[in-house]
Regions:
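Active-site core segments that coordinate phosphate-bearing ligands/cofactors
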Residues: 1-125, 129-219
Length: 219
């Protein structure tokens, strides 16, 4: 997609069931109204932090609303793999976060291959960026450092940067961004966890090809 800055393009990837899946799990599986019990997010976060990376074999393919990149399959369906009686809601919550992070890793690898450049870091915004656990999972699954920004509203900030350049306050988008975008924190990948997730990603990426013929229409 063309960039509004001086030159160049940016690559966009999209997961149709991102944080939506967390709310779906809480509302539909746990039967909890987050409006009446907002502390459930903190409780699940604490429970999931007690679970080892990899969720003791529980893996979730987060295709509840089909999948865009990397497969672009409107018929794709979500999948829960490796469920045992030893798993609890903390495992499920962590497995959801890990599944979304795995998808981000696959999308990033595809972009890096397409453009021939390496991604060094991620900048997180929005509600998910407030989760210490999720930031660490993203860092560990990708092997890249994760930045949290001082502003959660990237769209508004981007509009402000564009307006500042148009008004002549800055000579370029680069200069405007350097003055208006600020990093609040950095999460570094854990080397041991990164190795475990790298092994899990090898298994994870086999799930979709293995099950896609099961749910295809007419089969």
């Amino acid at each position: 997609m063309a960039c509004c800055a001086d030159e160049g393009y940016y690559c966009e990837t999209s997961l149709r069931s991102g944080t939506f899946l967390i709310d779906w799990f809480i509302q539909q599986m746990l039967k909890i109204d987050t409006n009446h019990k907002p502390e459930i997010y903190r409780q699940l976060e604490e429970e999931a932090q007690q679970v080892e990376p990899g969720s003791e074999g529980l893996m979730i393919l987060p295709y509840w609303n089909a999948v865009m990149n990397p497969y672009w399959d409107p018929d794709a369906r979500g999948c829960i793999i490796g469920l045992t009686s030893g798993h609890n809601r903390g495992h499920f919550y962590r497995a959801i976060l890990e599944g979304i992070a795995m998808e981000q890793s696959l999308a990033t690898k595809a972009v890096e291959k397409a453009v021939g450049q390496r991604t060094d870091e991620f900048a997180l915004i929005g509600g998910g960026a407030k989760s210490n656990l999720w930031r660490q999972i993203i860092a560990d699954t990708s092997g890249k450092k994760v930045l949290t920004m001082s502003s959660d509203e990237a769209s508004s900030l981007g509009a402000g940067i564009s307006a500042a350049v148009a008004a002549g306050w800055f000579h370029s988008f680069v200069e405007a961004a350097q003055n208006m975008v600020h990093v609040k924190g950095i999460t570094e990948p854990d080397s041991q966890n990164a190795e475990r997730y790298n092994n899990q990603l090898f298994k994870y990426r086999k799930i979709y090809p293995a099950i896609r013929e099961i749910y295809k229409p007419g089969i």
